[in-house]
Amino acid sequence: MQDSLFQRPVDRKRWQALYDRTEQPLESQHIWYLHTVLTQCFLPYKDPKVDTWERRNGDFSIALVSGHVRDPRSDTLTRRIGLPYGPKPRLFQSYISMKAVKNQSAVIPIENSMTEMMRMLGLSVTGGKHGTINSFKEQISRFVACHFTIIGPGPKGSYSHVKTTPVKRFDVFFPTDSRQGTLWPCEIQLTADYFESLKEHAVPFDFRALKPIQAVARSIDIYLWLTQRLPRLDKPLLLRWPVLHEMFGGALGLKDFRKRFPHHLRAAHLSYPDARIDQHSEGYMFRASPPPVPRTLVAVK
């Protein structure tokens, strides 16, 4: 990407300083995975305040339906909890995907407490009604309760629809001592269909590269899309503004999106410095680039 894209020098200095902290040889513990569809069709950026939601990117689509939950401290019936949104469920789904792929098991051990999980993901940990612990708990609960339909090309021009709830079992319990943090179980279990699909379609990436952008969902999505798309290009790919808007715009109008997208792309590019990207009068040109994770280090080939 040309230096002229860095319109404000402070941006480049900030992002480069954050990324420089991770400049050490790539090792297996740095490699995480995500289902390829989730690197092309993304969760909402903000709370859509609806119970159904769909995002499309070319031949692939993902449709979400809010799941039902019940708080054991309440006598009320189950209720729809809402759809996951923002950066936190993106980080969590990457974590459970990484564990499943590396261990080759649908049963995934997780950290003993929510705060340990958050620190492992690089998130700040604050308590209170408006603290990060409560928001993290809510987003992960929304994600694990959500029903997914993954849609992609099928045989003879058809489209295949795979309905799945990625997590088969996930229990959160609430201690009677209010001074004790909300605890997590020692493991979760993915559904068989989702696990098999993940093994076949896992995209590797360097988790350290997410650290500078982990609080910005749109930059995370752009980075993950770049990591799976650019190494597979055999010729330059021009994406015009309407297509980019459909992919990454979310609820933004096209005009606002065109103002904001360059900043998010700069951030993602600094986390993937080998990505070859050029400005174009109608959008951006993407070119074949070295993968951020060499094939020799990939757990599933």
What are these regions (language model features)?
Residues 1-301:
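Charged, alpha-helix-forming regions
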